[in-house]
């Protein structure tokens, strides 16, 4: 899980999701997991 000020899709499988007021990127590739913070 990377914590970034700007979360971007890193590949076609990445999805940008909002959960509990946080912006997350979920992906089948574990290295692409990000959250905004």
UniProtKB/Swiss-Prot annotation:
Its cofactor is Zn(2+). InterPro entries: Ribosomal_bL36, Ribosomal_bL36_sp. Keywords: Metal-binding, Ribonucleoprotein, Ribosomal protein, RNA-binding, rRNA-binding, Zinc. The lineage of its organism: Bacteria, Thermotogati, Deinococcota, Deinococci, Deinococcales. Part of the 50S ribosomal subunit. Disulfide bonds: none annotated. PANTHER family: 50S RIBOSOMAL PROTEIN L36, CHLOROPLASTIC, LARGE RIBOSOMAL SUBUNIT PROTEIN BL36C. It holds the Pfam family Ribosomal_L36. The gene is rpmJ. Zn(2+) binds at residues 11, 14, 27, 32. Belongs to the bacterial ribosomal protein bL36 family. This is Large ribosomal subunit protein bL36. One of its GO terms (biological process) is translation. GO terms for cellular component: cytoplasm; ribonucleoprotein complex; ribosome. GO terms for molecular function: metal ion binding; rRNA binding; structural constituent of ribosome. Binds the 23S rRNA. It comes from Deinococcus radiodurans (strain ATCC 13939 / DSM 20539 / JCM 16871 / CCUG 27074 / LMG 4051 / NBRC 15346 / NCIMB 9279 / VKM B-1422 / R1).
């Amino acid at each position: 899980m990377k914590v970034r000020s700007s979360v971007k899709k890193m590949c076609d499988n990445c999805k940008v999701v909002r959960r509990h007021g946080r912006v997350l990127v979920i992906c089948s590739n574990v290295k692409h997991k990000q959250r905004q913070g």
